[in-house]
């Protein structure tokens, strides 16, 4: 009897709860308006005018990851972050902004063809598009394989590049690479050449860490001894030739050396581990180490071809924390310095102010330079974790200096 009463009580309680809940739902839903909810779209809202691009400077193209591009037009935001500028699918970094002009850093992604366009926060549509191009600031050159290594490099008057090549650790000789990148054998040699340079007679001169300077008179002509330094401890690792055919050479020695075409040798006391030498405007420039400090000096050359007193140009170690390995001049006197720094090329102006060339773009240690045709500066590079050693061609937008 007790169980029956308990069941009846629970049954009635459940029916009461269901009835109460049903009435509550009916009240709630019955009180709602069954009409359409109001739209959140504001038909009276006005958007900003769409941006318009009229011109871009530099016109047509820029260096990827290097140049700041100026965009002129209308309806830009004066807040840099509200202007979204696209080079193809890559956004550029807006550095400065006004209502009619933007200054934008080009992204580091070379593309031969792209559409340049932009949007402004608050405007409904993109701007018009302009065809544009992002050129590479450097390219790998010469099809140097992973098992090959390059030491000395030089160029001839036709813009061909010559390189001392080793393969699987064994010297092969000198190869010639045309401006178009086609390789061919120039001469064979069982030795790697630390540095090579053409003279005004089209002879190729070379040094290879001994006390002699060698000469090749043309394709297929093996290197022959041209001159020997009297000091038996001398080791020559860098060489250059001036317009008179005078050869300058140096290394980790107590002297600098000049050799005339009659093979007479002059020595100039200067103790340093010299990594490279270069000529410009009647001066001999020297990159070397003294007491583990990397420096650049210059020596005046008088009318008799003799060196004057050394003058310090720049302390590379203190200013950049790196070591200078290579020197080369533009025709207007800018000095390119190849180093082992994170940004491996330093550009020194005639007033002796310096700056890293193309920061965050050039990837490898630079060991040697040689000017090609036009604005092409070739560099022999060391291997890194991500890049094998080889040759790169840097777009400098300057003509190279020729000694003759």
Label each PLM-derived region with a short phrase.
Residues 27-31:
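C-terminal motif of bacterial Sec signal peptides marking the signal peptidase cleavage site
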Residues 33-78, 112, 123-144:
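Beta-strand/beta-sandwich contexts
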Residues 121, 165-168, 208-211, 244, ...:
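Short loop/turn segments immediately following the C-termini of beta-strands
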Residues 135-136, 177-182, 216-221, 259-263, ...:
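Short loop/turn segments that connect beta-strands within beta-propeller blades
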Residues 136-145, 181-188, 221-230, 262-269, ...:
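A short beta-strand motif characteristic of beta-propeller blades
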Residues 146-159, 189-203, 208, 230-253, ...:
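Beta-rich, blade/repeat-based domains predominating
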Residues 172-176, 211-215, 255-258, 295-297, ...:
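A short loop-to-beta-strand structural motif that recurs across blades of beta-propeller domains
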Residues 364-404:
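Blade-level signature of beta-propeller repeat domains, shared across WD40, Kelch, NHL, RCC1
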